Amino acid sequence: MLKVEIPFPPSMNRLWRATKGGGVYRSPEYVKWKEAASWAIAAQCRAGRIKGPFKLTMLVVPPDKRHRDLDNLFKASLDALAAAGVIANDRHCRWIEARWVEDGAPCTLILDDLGGKHE
């Protein structure tokens, strides 16, 4: 089991921006968040990497009173885990469990190795 705490993830709706020519690019907000989250993850997970299938549990503290979709936070969190090298690829995620919590870190990620390929 690996446990990391990261900044509150951006919503899926905030990850990408469209150009006038029809292209897409990562939003500056997402780029900044992903770099900060990847550094935080790498600092906390020096001893572990998961190469194969895994379960992700997310415990998220809402930053304010706005209504949010919890499922919009998965992609950015998984991308940060992959960028930090903690998981080989987010396609190996076999099970996601997530819930809002009252207190704690903005976002706590708990990874359970389902394949026994933990280094």
Enumerate the predicted regions with their spans:
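Acidic, proline/glycine-enriched N-terminal capping motif
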Residues: 1-119
